[in-house]
A protein has these predicted regions:
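Short consensus segments that form the blades of beta-propeller domains
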Residues: 16-20
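Short coil-to-beta transition motif at edge beta-strands of beta-rich domains
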Residues: 1-14
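Generic structural hydrophobic/aromatic packing signal, biased to beta-strands
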Residues: 7-9, 29, 45
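Contiguous surface segments at macromolecular interaction interfaces
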Residues: 36-136
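Short, charged/polar surface micro-motifs in flexible loops or helix N-caps
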Residues: 13-15, 32-35
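Short beta-strand-centered aromatic/proline hotspots
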Residues: 21-33
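Functionally constrained cores in energy, signaling, and assembly domains
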Residues: 7, 32, 54
Length: 136
């Protein structure tokens, strides 16, 4: 993990199928964080770029809908690992989904700033991101 990384927070209850895994928050890694030098296993969050969803919001934002089904239609599984890595463009689309959920809240501006910051750090063209998101 590096300072241009987002930690996406997901959950599901043990009684629910993996397909019900939902997103309940996201935060940028702190500007001075270097994963290779991390000794205590704690990922420090950026002071500003942190977004948390209410339970009602989170239950509408399912994690696995952001990924294409596998070629053999096997059930997607989180497995026993703590981290999943995926393209920054996928993360940018997830941030756009969070922004849409937060349209009528006091977190709307923060969500927009979060997207701008993430896209700038990762050299993602926001215009293309918006166009691709409108197709969905």
């Amino acid at each position: 993990l590096y300072p241009n990384s987002v930690c996406l927070l997901t959950a599901r209850s043990k009684k629910e199928p993996e397909s019900s895994r939902y997103i309940w928050g996201a935060f940028m890694v702190r500007d001075d964080f270097e994963g290779a030098k991390c000794q205590d296993g704690i990922i420090r969050a950026h002071d500003k770029y942190q977004i948390f969803l209410s339970e009602q919001e989170a239950r509408t934002l399912l994690f696995w809908t952001n990924f294409e089904p596998s070629s053999n239609n096997a059930e997607r599984k989180w497995g026993s690992v703590e981290f999943k890595y995926f393209p920054n463009t996928t993360m940018a689309r997830i941030l756009c989904d969070i922004y849409l959920l937060k349209q009528n809240t006091d977190q709307k501006k923060l969500c927009e700033q979060f997207i701008n910051y993430f896209c700038e750090l990762n050299k993602i063209d926001k215009k293309l991101l918006i166009l691709s998101h409108q197709k969905d």
